Amino acid sequence: MCPSDFSSRSLFLEAKEEEYKQRRRVPLDSRRRVRRACLSCRAKKIRCSGSEPCQACIATPSQCKYADSLKERTPSKQFIAELSQRQKCFEYLMELLCPSLPHDTRSLVKLCKHVESSLASGSDVRSLLIPGSIDQSVLKVAATNNKDDSSAVKSANVSFPSSSTPPSSDSNFSSIQNTDLNTSIKFTENISANAIHVNQDKVIRSANNLIINSQPILPVRSFLDALGEPIYLSPTSSTYFLNSVLASLQLNSSNTPESLLIDYQSKIPEDLSSSLLPLELNTLQSTPTSVSVGSASSQGTHEYSIINLTSNHSSFSLKALKKIAHNLLPPVSVAERYANEFFLRYQSFFYFYPPSVFSNRYQILADGLVNSDTLDTGFLAVALLIVVLGHFSNNNINVLPKEVQLSHIDSMIQISEQLISSLLNRCTLSSIQAVFLLSLYHFLTGNFKCAYSYLGFAIHSAHTLGLEHGSTDNSTLNEVSTEETSIRICWSLRVLASFLYIQSGITPIINLFPNGLNSLKLPTVVPELEARHLPSSVFHFVAIIKYAEISVRSLNSLYESSSDYLMDVSNFPKLLLKVERIYSQARNWKLNLTHQQLNGTNDTSDLLFHSNVSLHLFYHYLIVKVSCPIMFFYLNNWYSVKPSSFTKGLNNKPSLEDVFSNLETCYESAKAIVQLSSKLLSAGQMDKCFYLEFEILYCSAIVLFLFSVMHLGAENPLLESIYLLEDMGSRTIDSKVRLEKLKSAIEIFDINSATEMPINEPLSASFESVNKENSQSGYMAWQNWVTELSSSNIPLGHALGNPESNNSSNSFKPSHPSQSFLVNESLDFSSNPKEPPFLPWSEALLNMDMQLNRLGP
């Protein structure tokens, strides 16, 4: 029965709410929120009044104690971020003060005890803040207390005598890797003969401190360069490979580098640096230039007072050097031409400076809006080097008019080196860019020891500045562009170090790719960082980064277990598997290129034509590099054996069939390098001034020479490669010596070449008749080819030449495996018609119309 007052729905809801309130444990009038409870109430899980002492602790005689609120509070995100930045700051300071001290807890505790004991003994704090002094003293103290640290003392007190030579290398790789680290440090000796400024010695000391803890990846060998100084090479260098081949072929002592050096001793200038530079720069030694500080005229001519640029610049102040550098800069129109050529040629594979920022800052310099005292020293050096490198690249394409030519190239390089010497005490982005550019210049001119030292300083400065984390001092770009610039410069430093390792065998300064390509974010397209009116080259940059990672890892794994190319026969199958694995990785890299990069090697009007061809050159260059041990193994084990003895399992050796695909791939890559180099030469884009493409073609010529010696393959383009090398190798003394060494080896062997020359005619006799005139190109070459084809009596609609020669693998794999690489001397390869020259359809139709209508050009 419902109660009497239960007359509506609202009364029912009120009754239910009152019943719910009465069921609560704490009455409404006595309910109170307590912000914190004491530790005793927390342990007993009872209600605490929040007072001190609380009611529960008073009732039960116990100690009422509250927890510290500051200790319980979790740190904020801002505090954690600031703490991590604080830790980075201390790490950077430790890198500067103690570059060779490990940053583990044990070493830091020893450092702290040493500093405390030094301060307690009354030592001055300033004496403890000298970079590189704390770690050496700590390691000395640790060596007296603990015998286990003797190796650390040895690494911290390495001496660098300029006249000493490294210990003789043993043939065993394991024993070489345990030798003294002097062999990996001697690259920094005598950084440059024209390093007149005393501060340039800091480059050597910084590079030495950086590479003290670096372990040599490959053994090194001591040879003599063109100047009689020792250079240290590992098996990845082409010079090492050529010396190993000539030693296996038992050449006479008359072909050693020392005897070849005698003929060129009179041609070597007294200045060390100028002999390694292009010959255009050697004019400074013969014709001193007296210039003075003045303003640049509009025609690009410069007038100076009585300052001899060939004299010692150490007497000049930094202010005077800035004035000289400012007046050596060409006008804006000329500088833009050279800068565009530089950005198009070299920023496809490296990244040095944002083009838009360079253009704006150069315009400010040219307009004289900034006082010479406040000029950015780093940008002055960057501007000089960019203009110089762009000038050399532009000279490869065409002959420049007189008003555009630079008359003080040598002075610009020397002044830039002096400006960089004043930047060594600073760690800024502009100083890293300037040192990096100078390292690239020395690398391109073949002065690898200087390039190695400057590159080591640039890498150390970039690490100290924190470029890997996007920390720069550049305020002219936004946050995204600044981070992207830092990433690109870090990748560029690693790519240049990879090139030094691949070409010259110089051990990398740091572990270039510790986590593969995951150590840094790959570059992306940022419009603010691209050059105006020029296509973006970011995809070429990403491709060359992946190439460098594959090459360094592959060559390291390939050569680390080999000893002077004299591998044991039982280890040859493992080596063969390694080479085939590298082949597949290189092919995958090439297949992942863009369509323009794969098929852009024919259109010479494309602005990225040289970059596209260079990617293909690098691919074939890697194939040739990794194939050298296979060829050397074949030379030492099978070359002296008769062809009928090539049976499977002979003397526990692998059969010749196992080497078919590898030697064929190497031979085709060597031929492709010659063809691509000829294409660059005909297009006027061959880098004749610099060393990079010369080294690739030189390595290909060595391989072709070895194929000719062993009578392997057909249509060997060795003569064409020698002609190209003669055209390219006349710029530096070192390249001349290396080319003469290869030619003298060919003359001794007197090879019967399979190219367009009679049988039994020596190869050395054909040097003078190697197509020394420029070959025709374009429509005339195509017309001559049609005429030659029509007069060869070949039926139309059929394959040209022998059916077996259409497939490239047929010339390497005949029916009988024992005759796979032997050239049949009875065949006349000169009767095969030539391949048609490349001719754009637009040019062909235009010339046809001109001939039909007799319009004339």
Swiss-Prot record:
Signal peptide range: none
UniProt entry tagged with the keyword Transcription regulation: yes
DNA-binding region: 38-64
Compartment list: Nucleus
Source organism (scientific name): Schizosaccharomyces pombe (strain 972 / ATCC 24843)
CDD domains referenced in this protein's UniProt entry, alphabetically: fungal_TF_MHR, GAL4
Biased composition (Polar residues): 803-819
GO annotations of cellular component type: membrane; nucleus
Gene3D superfamilies: Zn(2)-C6 fungal-type DNA-binding domain
Tagged with keyword Hydrolase: no
Domain of life: Eukaryota
UniProt cross-references to SUPFAM superfamilies, sorted A to Z: Zn2/Cys6 DNA-binding domain
Gene Ontology biological process terms, A to Z: DNA-templated transcription; positive regulation of thiamine biosynthetic process; positive regulation of transcription by RNA polymerase II
Classification via Pfam families: Fungal_trans, Zn_clus
Official protein name in the record: Thiamine repressible genes regulatory protein thi5
Chain spans, region Disordered: 152-175, 797-819
